[in-house]
Design a protein with these regions (language model features):
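Acidic, small-polar-rich N-terminal luminal/periplasmic segments of exported/outer-membrane proteins
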Residues: 1-123, 475
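Outer-membrane beta-barrel translocator/receptor signature
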Residues: 84-87, 97-179, 185-191, 238, ...
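Acidic/polar loop-and-plug regions of large Gram-negative outer-membrane beta-barrel proteins
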Residues: 163-167, 180-247, 260-291, 334-363, ...
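Surface-exposed extracellular loop regions of Gram-negative outer-membrane beta-barrel proteins
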Residues: 202-215, 321-326, 426-474, 479, ...
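Face-selective signature of the C-terminal outer-membrane beta-barrel domain
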Residues: 240-263, 283-404
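Membrane-embedded beta-barrel scaffold of Gram-negative outer-membrane proteins
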Residues: 243-247, 251-259, 263-271, 436, ...
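Conserved C-terminal beta-signal and adjacent last beta-strands/turns
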Residues: 312-313, 437, 473, 555-662
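Gram-negative outer-membrane beta-barrel transporters
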Residues: 485, 490-494, 507-592, 659
Length: 662
């Protein structure tokens, strides 16, 4: 649980879920977004104008930039994270700046996502997987692990995967090359691990998002592709982490962690705007981006007793540094048709102010972000630790500089500090049942006042607002009976945003997300496993500029999200398991005035797997049919704050794979 470390689920004043590598493999998940479709608190969207996976948790975005890797921000590939090297996907629900530090990408208000890499198990592992999809996409993956040395203390795990071919979207081709190496050493009082990974991801003719005009268009056929044939998205990422722990005594442990990432992205896109009657308007947008990121964290964690009161204390310091280089070019608009796409020759670059910025061949520095923080907390235990009270505070600094795309001159700068506290209480009613409550905050960088708004000058132009402080209160109950478990939570999160009042740029806007969240998991009957839940959300704009749209619902936040997945080990056929999953998302508003909305949708996924032994080798055959009914639907609107682009749901997709353990 962030800097609090490994905690019993029942003893924390928060809710979270971990999705394991077994689930990832059994569901043939290709990326983090495939995994998170199991979570009723999460809906998957897309970044603005690109193909970045974006996750909406409790109605607030978590950008893929803000996913942490082994507890450190900013290290994973920025647009798409392959699933083959992942041991666990951990979803934390709720604000979390005290626990994890401020998310550098500006997300994390509604939750956090942490990825844990695979480690070598005690037994040798040599696993090969072959797979294919009905569109023509093929894949091969290898997972090899060994432990060596005295008492098998040194471990090595290698994961490699390759995918290539056309997807179930017409004329859309994807290719992926992924490599990850994990090393670890387990000493008596010393533990160390290191991970390095590389990922290349390319999409040719990727189906773009659609921005609605005055109406929401009917969803095209889910297999249709309205991309231009010259569009593509390409990224190459290299990343690594290092973590060490040392037990100074039975009561005190120290840790040190560090990581880095170097990334390159190139995109040539043309995302259409719907103008009615099937007609669209689009412009070429080409960009090149390079990222250099390093991050680190160190801390101490321990426990002691004062009379009848136990203490679990922690203190830590963290730093994150990112340099972004970027360049872009655009074209004049060209016409198209959403339902009868026509290929258009690649248009020339436009000229004039803001039509381009920087050199696409050599992108210049446009942004430098640095965050640093100090945190301290104590969890006090009363009544033989049946009552736990957590108190803590993090001193968070956020510094950001932006630079002109063409001249390289500094355009703006920002440096602010904020204290962000936490208070949490857990009471164990029984060994199986606990109740909890918390107050915690989320922190994101404040905006810089523009020179003008709506043609009128802004009085405090250039002023940097203090970090936006989102306040959350939550209460709930948890149950873990061994075979089944779950949680019920009620929460309210207030998130400020910028407005202009009497010509002054302020943080006077506010969005309040209130909700009820039910999640469950377990095996209620022998051979029958369930995973799912429901989230009810009211995302209200409680304070807006001049009261416009006040009281309306936020863009892209459904009032109801429900997931239920099940597995059934078929009696009489050892090794055969049938699976199913139903996802429901209610309608979503696509404009702040709530005049436009996309319809609700329900998706059915079906699957089966069969485990057998052939010549002393474990073999598993898997089949999965996503969107089994072949529904055409808009899956999401928006995701990036203030935008309302539409993303078409994926078509019916049949995935087959075979895994052999040698």
């Amino acid at each position: 649980v962030g800097i609090l470390g490994n905690q019993d689920y029942m003893d924390t004043p928060f809710t979270s879920t971990a999705y394991t590598s077994k689930l990832i493999q059994d569901q043939q998940a290709r990326s983090v977004s495939d995994v998170l479709q199991n979570d009723p608190s999460v809906r998957v969207a897309r970044g603005f104008g690109n193909f970045q996976e974006l996750y909406v948790v409790r109605g607030f975005p978590v950008f893929s930039d803000d996913i942490s890797y082994n507890g450190l921000y900013g290290l994973l590939p920025r647009q798409y994270v392959a699933a083959e090297f992942i041991e666990r996907v951990e979803v934390f629900r709720g604000a979390n700046t005290f626990l994890n530090g401020a998310a550098p990408g500006g997300g994390g208000i509604g939750g956090a996502i942490n990825i844990l890499p695979k480690r070598a198990p005690n037994e040798p592992l040599t696993r090969l997987t072959l797979g294919a999809e009905n569109g023509g996409q093929g894949m091969i993956a290898a997972d090899i692990a060994r432990r060596f040395g005295e008492e098998q203390r040194f471990g090595v795990r290698l994961n490699a995967a390759k995918r290539a071919g056309e997807t179930t979207v017409e004329d859309e081709d994807r290719s992926l090359d992924m490599f990850a190496l994990g090393l670890d050493y387990q000493g008596d009082n010393f533990r160390i691990s290191a991970d390095i990974g590389h990922q290349y991801h390319f999409i040719d003719s990727p189906r773009p998002s659609v921005t609605p005009g005055s109406v929401i268009p009917s969803a095209p056929d889910a297999e249709d592709n309205f991309a231009q044939p010259w569009t593509y998205s390409k990224e190459k990422q290299t990343f690594g982490t290092f973590r060490a722990e040392y037990d100074f005594s039975d009561a005190v442990t120290g840790w040190l962690a560090a990581g880095m990432r170097e990334g390159e992205e190139k995109n040539l896109l043309a995302s259409p705007t719907y103008v009615g009657g099937g007609a669209t308007s689009a412009s070429l947008f080409e960009n090149a981006r390079e990222d250099d990121i390093w991050t680190g964290e160190t801390g101490l964690r321990g426990r002691f007793q004062t009379g009848a009161v136990s203490h679990q204390w922690v203190t830590s310091a963290a730093i994150f540094d990112s340099e972004e280089r970027n360049a872009y070019a655009t074209s004049a608009a060209f016409a198209g048709d959403l339902y009868s796409p026509v290929d258009v020759a690649r248009p020339p670059y436009a000229t004039g102010p803001f039509a381009s910025g920087g050199s696409l061949d050599d992108p210049g520095l446009v942004g430098h972000t640095r965050t640093q923080s100090l945190a301290i907390a104590d969890t006090l235990g009363f009544m033989d630790d049946r009552l736990l009270v957590t108190l803590g505070v993090r001193r968070q600094g956020i510094e950001m500089r932006t630079y002109d795309y063409n001249s390289g001159d500094r355009a703006s700068s920002y440096k602010r500090y904020e204290n962000t506290p936490v208070t949490g209480v857990v009471y164990r009613l029984t060994d199986e049942l606990s109740v909890y409550a918390n107050y915690i905050e989320g922190l994101v960088k404040g905006d810089i006042a523009p020179a003008e708004s709506g043609g009128a000058p802004v009085v405090n132009a250039g002023e940097a607002l203090a970090p936006y402080v989102a306040e959350q209160i939550e209460a709930g109950i948890k149950y873990d009976g061994g075979f089944v478990g779950g949680s019920l939570a009620v929460f309210s999160t207030d998130r400020p945003f910028s407005t202009i009042e009497n010509g002054v740029f302020t943080d006077g806007g506010e969005q309040r997300n209130r909700g009820i969240e039910l999640s469950m998991f377990g095996e209620p009957l022998y051979g029958v496993r369930l995973l799912g839940g429901v989230t009810l959300l009211d995302a209200e704009l409680t304070s807006t500029q001049d009261g416009l749209n006040e009281g309306n619902h936020a863009i892209g936040v459904p009032r109801t999200q429900a997931n239920i997945g099940g597995e059934w080990d078929l009696p009489g056929v050892p090794g055969l398991t049938l699976t199913s999953r139903v996802l429901y998302t209610s309608s979503q508003y696509a404009t702040l005035n709530n005049d436009l909305e996309i319809p609700s949708w329900t998706r059915l996924d079906l699957g089966a797997r069969y485990r057998m032994v052939i010549d002393d080798h474990d073999v598993t055959i898997r089949a999965r049919l996503d969107n089994a009914t072949g529904r055409d639907y808009w899956a999401s609107t928006g995701g990036y704050p203030g935008r309302n682009y539409l993303v078409l749901g994926a078509p019916r997709t049949l995935s087959l794979s075979a895994t052999v353990d040698f």
